[in-house]
Amino acid sequence: MFAAGLAPFYASNFSLWSAAYCSSAGPGGCSFPLDPAAVKKPSFCIADILHAGVGDLGAAPEGLAGASAAALTAHLGSVHPHASFQAAARSPLRPTPVVAPSEVPAGFPQRLSPLSAAYHHHHPQQQQQQQQPQQQQPPPPPRAGALQPPASGTRVVPNPHHSGSAPAPSSKDLKFGIDRILSAEFDPKVKEGNTLRDLTSLLTGGRPAGVHLSGLQPSAGQFFASLDPINEASAILSPLNSNPRNSVQHQFQDTFPGPYAVLTKDTMPQTYKRKRSWSRAVFSNLQRKGLEKRFEIQKYVTKPDRKQLAAMLGLTDAQVKVWFQNRRMKWRHSKEAQAQKDKDKEAGEKPSGGAPAADGEQDERSPSRSEGEAESESSDSESLDMAPSDTERTEGSERSLHQTTVIKAPVTGALITASSAGSGGSSGGGGNSFSFSSASSLSSSSTSAGCASSLGGGGASELLPATQPTASSAPKSPEPAQGALGCL
């Protein structure tokens, strides 16, 4: 909105009007001649706009020419009689607010500012001269869709009668307009429908000369011709439908063999399984045996040997290389498994092997133990209340007899002589029993008999303690000594 307080500032500091119109010698005369002191090159710097006339014009109190400001105010008052325009008595930085006119003069369009309205108001004769030739020579009717530029030197006046004859091109008419891009023509589904429609038109319409479709099935053209356009429209307009065109394409895929088969992503078989870039080599028995024999001889083959082996077995160098790598890995695993198995076996044999050795030691110790039983003073049988068996008694008696006859022969002879000497004073039964006891083992009964005979003769009683340690095979105990003492 135009503010009247800035009008003197703009009029005096900017050359909005040329000197031909703003000077007194201009055409038609100008009621507000431009101050010659204020005429300078226009500047659009913000500092020059705000402080345009502060230091340049010292005569004027606010940096504005008083005559030019008063003339412009009077001019604006004559143009707009309903509005009150006052001279800018204050600084142009804080102009006096003025109410804008409520009614715009009917002779000027709404988009023209009051300054341009004043310009047009002071030159009505020039406007009338320009409008008269236009009325005398009406322009030829423009063609539909053709845009005619306005003639030079004429002012374009909006005419409501000619506005509808040459409309602006819409976005639909443009090839790459927004409406065309967003339209259904760019939809891929619609494009497929158009392709089917073109095929149908080619089959049902005229065929070019020299083209014979005898190889095709006769029902192909009828099938495409019988496609209902309603189904196509429903397929386009109903996106929630489950692709009805799939069934149509599957139906005519077999109908049109060769180049007419429609190959799209819907008709192509969906194979999501990833195909391996390499295939597993299958070796024959002969090849496997040859590789195994070579592996037994040589675990690592050199490149020349590998090529020679591959040529002999009918394999490639890469196949032989991979086979040897896998075979070496298998061989290492088998060796590690065998070593672990042997280690576990050895660990299991150690505890079980110690038991037989202990049993053997016990068996070795048992004979010496049995031999020492005859000479040692052990009371195991008495403490455990166990009597020796008959076999032990017989063995002990034989060994004691052998020892007495070999080692203690003079003692036994002494015993015999002593017993014979002592038997003279005693009864015959007592002597016989004593001699029997000296030849056999000394048991409890023999000792008692010996004691009875010794009571008769004192010579034999002195030799009895000497014969007991050597002749008895039973373990020694304090009982025989006590019995002998009792007898004494």
Curated annotation (Swiss-Prot):
InterPro entries: H2.0_Homeobox_TF, HD, HD_metazoa, Homeobox_CS, Homeodomain-like_sf, HTH_motif. Keywords: Differentiation, DNA-binding, Homeobox, Nucleus, Transcription, Transcription regulation. Residues 125-135, 158-171, 433-454 have a biased composition (Low complexity). Residues 373-383 have a biased composition (Acidic residues). GO terms for molecular function: DNA-binding transcription factor activity, RNA polymerase II-specific; sequence-specific DNA binding. GO terms for cellular component: chromatin; nucleus. Its main location: nucleus. Residues 422-432 have a biased composition (Gly residues). SMART domains: HOX (SM00389). It comes from the Eukaryota. Belongs to the H2.0 homeobox family. Transcription factor required for TBX21/T-bet-dependent maturation of Th1 cells as well as maintenance of Th1-specific gene expression. Involved in embryogenesis and hematopoiesis. This is H2.0-like homeobox protein.
